[in-house]
């Protein structure tokens, strides 16, 4: 959708250009993700969804996107995955790329869930997020989970992933040859 969409995609960390496929007769298209894991199909007409900027795979043309900022600037600075996410709305199917397996939760009003920042993939636009510091010096330096966690507050639907690519890369780094 034009220069405005192009700049929006660039600002949110997505690829600048999107491929458009149009069927001229009944047919199928195969989608593959860039990382081993699930591809989640979400019907946007069921409600707006906020998605991690790197998790967009594909969508129908009727799905609209806009940049979604956290209300707290510290989320972007300290949160790891960044505070810039994308809100998808309109109608049609959205295909979300998941690193590892997708696990879905429904939160009641006021119910909170604490997740590793890199594990949060998507949430209903009715959810609110905040980033909190991990308590305790031992937990911060020896826990292996980082300094911050994301708190998601309901009501709404939350999708987390089991193996963010950053976690896998960190796990494999010990097995890589070292240059001396």
Regions found by a protein language model. Name each.
Residues 1-180:
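Composition-driven recognition of glycine/serine/threonine/acidic- and proline-rich low-complexity segments
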């Amino acid at each position: 959708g034009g220069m405005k969409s192009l700049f929006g995609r660039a600002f949110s960390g997505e690829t600048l250009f999107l491929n458009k496929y149009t069927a001229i007769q009944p047919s199928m298209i195969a989608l593959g993700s860039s990382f081993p894991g699930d591809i989640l199909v979400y019907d946007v007409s069921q409600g707006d969804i906020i998605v991690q900027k790197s998790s967009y795979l594909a969508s129908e043309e009727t799905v609209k996107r806009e940049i979604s900022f956290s209300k707290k600037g510290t989320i972007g600075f300290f949160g790891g995955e960044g505070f810039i996410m994308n809100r998808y709305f309109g109608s049609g199917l959205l295909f979300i790329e998941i690193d590892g397996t997708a696990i879905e939760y429904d939160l009641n009003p006021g119910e909170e869930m604490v997740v590793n920042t890199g594990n949060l993939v998507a949430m209903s636009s009715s959810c609110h997020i905040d980033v909190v510091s991990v308590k305790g010096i031992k937990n911060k330096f020896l826990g292996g989970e980082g300094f911050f966690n994301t708190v998601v507050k309901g009501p709404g639907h939350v999708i987390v992933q089991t193996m963010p690519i950053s976690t896998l890369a960190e796990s494999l780094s010990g097995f890589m040859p070292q240059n001396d």
